[in-house]
């Protein structure tokens, strides 16, 4: 009975947040996307957690993102372009890369910085017209064991972060499921699946785009 009441309360809270975001002023970047008439209701629902997060992160210096665009905007754009599931997988991959080692890998590849605040420029769509010695397909396959694909692509530290992220989400999902938590169980299983496939996509992306340039063919 208690769980049913909690589920109903959460549904009402999410509905109120969704409606208020839908009709409020576009104070935060993702609000513009949510209020757009060009995307479906399903995508807008997927963007709701990002909207909530931006209301926290944009009002605290503790949550400043080192990337441009920020991880929340990156994820929002991915959902808008590729749909909720694929977009969340792509967003998960970016969040894994948003770690203390990002600046090292960025400088190693001589990638650009955002002029206004020095953040690391990293868009969804990359335009590197070069051949890589690493196989994106092979990187994806070996990522069946999380982290192995990124390590193969030359990003061992990102691989460790990916392995740790998958472990945390998966172990949390198993714990919640074993305790028969009807709310957190399915939710965390979904998160675990997203981070796992995000790791596979991240290995593919690392092997295809984030490689040292031997020939300047851009």
Model-inferred region functions:
Residues 22-26:
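Boundary at the C-terminal end of the N-terminal hydrophobic targeting segment
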Residues 33-218:
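Hydrophobic alpha-helical membrane segments
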Residues 28-32:
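Bulky hydrophobic segments
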Residues 2-13:
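Positively charged n-region of N-terminal signal peptides that target proteins for export
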